[in-house]
From Swiss-Prot:
This is Adenylosuccinate synthetase. It comes from Phenylobacterium zucineum (strain HLK1). Belongs to the adenylosuccinate synthetase family. Binds 1 Mg(2+) ion per subunit. The gene is purA. GTP binds at residues 12-18, 40-42, 303, 329-331, 411-413.
């Protein structure tokens, strides 16, 4: 199978960056297909640490990297990220990076709106305040400015006028000053020669790449449980994060995603607000957060931590068509005498094995746990199955049984090479 799609199978922060970086050795092209610069990836290569939030992880490997049409792009942030990587010795030019010419732009007015709404809200969603949601609103409302619009000053000016006709009343209602249209036009005109060299019809490139027999790695951002349709709505992101979006967000078509690899932590974390059935507000939760270094790459916020939720991951396996999972951060569980796995939930007087759609029901769920004996030995840095303690192997096998998908890869540290390969997704 030529293509692999990597998605987070929980609430994000599962370790996708490291796995995409590791898998990109086997790929020819890496593609981002949704989200914006609201979800960060941390890559550790030797003694160098790279923090990305918009660029595909493949750029660090020198692989052709494509930002697809499903991504909303802050062009100023993109240039800053390119500059930062350049200072770390990774040179990125149009020969290495392609930006879909039909991708929509995040503008400063989107950030303003995002932050003002969150500040005014009684029930906060926990947005990063980077303008992703408002940018998607304008995309769906057919008033967004797209990369290709930077070619045409006259059309760009008209589009800005139309955009401000919508945003001005919103800004007024939130106590924000009117946005300066001519100033925005001048900013975008100055930006155009820096961005347009990267702009190309990504769908056409991908069609040619696949026909030539090259391997494509699709890189998802965030996690399936933050999907705008299938996640814990309204505590979700503003895009579809499930594997099916790889086709729509790249333009390659429904056969494009290929093998779907779900990235799953050996426990559960979540950033921001929203239901979290297995959350631990005790010493074990603190242990997971401290040992796992559970702080957001983009926001620096502490992540909420809890036991592994097999019911949620099982649901994610079904929603995404996951063929195999990559289990990460197993080493964080080292030394815990007892481990728990959530196998389902109690809701009132009945037991269910899935997360219901209603927010009220989600908040009333009581997890049903299965206990397992932990291990005292270290798993950190293990690079083969035989290096794992017997109880760690039992834990992994039980997860496979409960979620209905095999473990294809096992990550035992942030280092790229501390990865146990059970089956190669590109060969499956």
């Amino acid at each position: 199978m030529a293509n692999v799609t990597v998605i987070g199978a929980q609430w994000g922060d599962e370790g996708k960056g490291k796995l995409v970086d590791w898998l990109s050795n086997r790929a020819d092209v890496v593609v981002r297909f949704q989200g914006g610069h609201n979800a960060g990836h941390t890559l550790v290569v030797g003694n160098q640490t790279y923090k990305l939030s918009l660029l595909p992880s493949g750029v660090v490997q020198g692989k052709l990297s494509i930002i697809g049409n499903g991504v909303v792009v802050d062009p100023w942030h993109l240039l800053k990220e390119i500059e930062t990587l350049g200072a770390q010795g990774v040179s990125i030019g149009p020969d290495l990076l392609v930006l879909a010419d039909n991708a929509c732009l995040i503008l400063p007015l989107h950030r303003d709106l995002d932050q003002a709404r969150e500040a005014a809200a009684t029930n906060k969603i926990g947005t990063t305040g980077r303008g992703i949601g408002p940018a998607y609103e304008d995309k769906v409302g057919r008033r967004a400015i797209r990369v290709a619009d930077l070619h045409d000053r006259e059309a760009l000016e008209a589009k800005i006028d139309r955009l401000l006709a919508h945003h001005t009343p919103l800004r007024r209602g939130l106590g924000l000053p009117e946005y300066d249209g001519p100033a925005l036009l001048a900013e975008l005109e100055a930006l155009a020669p820096k961005i347009l060299p990267y702009a190309r019809p990504a769908w056409l490139m991908l069609d040619e790449i696949v026909k030539a027999g090259s391997r494509v790695l699709f890189e998802g951002a965030q996690g399936a449980l933050l999907d705008v349709d299938h996640g814990t709505y309204p505590y979700v992101t503003s895009s579809n994060t499930v594997a099916g979006q790889a086709a729509a967000g790249s333009g390659l078509g429904p056969k494009g995603p290929g093998y779907v690899l779900g990235i799953v932590k050996a426990y559960t974390t979540r950033v921001g607000e929203g239901p979290f059935p297995t959350e631990l507000n005790d010493e074990v939760g603190q242990h997971l957060g401290t040992v796992g270094r559970e702080f957001g790459t983009v926001t620096g916020r502490s992540r909420r931590c809890g036991w592994f939720d097999a019911a949620l991951v099982r649901q994610s396996v079904a929603l995404n068509g996951i063929a195999g999972i990559a289990l990460t951060k197993l080493d964080v569980l080292d030394g815990l005498p007892t481990l728990k796995i959530c196998t389902g939930y109690r809701l009132g007087d009945r037991e269910i094995g899935y997360l219901p759609a209603g927010l009220k029901a989600q908040r009333e769920l009581a997890p049903v746990y299965e206990e397992m004996e932990g291990w005292s030995e270290t798993t950190q840095g293990a690079r083969s199955w035989k290096d794992l303690p017997a109880n760690a192997v039992k834990y992994v096998r039980r997860i496979e049984e409960l979620i209905g998908a095999p473990v294809a890869l096992l990550s035992t540290s942030p280092q790229r090479d501390d990865t146990i390969l059970m089956r190669d997704p590109f060969q499956d």
